[in-house]
From Swiss-Prot:
InterPro entries to which the protein is assigned, alphabetical: Restrct_endonuc-II-like (IPR011335), tRNA_endonuc-like_dom_sf (IPR011856), UPF0102_YraN-like (IPR003509)
Naturally occurring in which organism (per UniProt): Leifsonia xyli subsp. xyli (strain CTCB07)
Any Pfam family matching the protein: UPF0102
Superkingdom of origin organism: Bacteria
One function term, GO molecular function aspect: nucleic acid binding
Family under the similarity heading: Belongs to the UPF0102 family.
Name of protein: UPF0102 protein Lxx14785
């Protein structure tokens, strides 16, 4: 596995643990179809949350959340709709969030949660 992939997987694990620590219940990870992937699917209260995780080792190339372009947000919206078509929407609202993780390998990674990006 390439270092970039390892860093991304580590960031997703950090984000998943952070969500659980903040009361979210994980219901899926790395849901893939031909057109893309949803990193984390979770529930908080009556909201199903679809989470895109972006991880960077440093900010030399910008903050991780800067990687969420309008095109990526549109793709996430389409993936969320496809997930709902596949599994049926759960009761309550839907939301798409982003989590940026910096220094994922450190004992204290920086986590930035941005709810409702689409």
């Amino acid at each position: 596995m390439a270092k970039k992939d390892e860093l991304g997987r580590r960031g997703e694990s950090v984000a998943a643990h952070w969500l659980e620590a903040h009361g979210y219940v994980l219901i899926g990870r790395n849901w893939r179809i031909r057109s893309g992937e949803i990193d984390i699917i979770a529930r908080t209260g009556n909201i199903t949350v679809f989470v895109e995780v972006k991880t960077r080792a440093t900010t030399h190339y910008g903050h991780p959340l800067e990687a969420i372009t309008p095109e990526k947000a549109a793709r996430l919206r389409r993936l969320t709709a496809e997930w709902c078509r596949t599994y049926g929407p759960l009761p309550g609202a839907l939301r798409v969030d982003a989590i940026g993780v910096l220094n994922a390998w450190s004992a204290n990674p920086e986590i930035h949660h941005l709810p409702g990006i689409v």
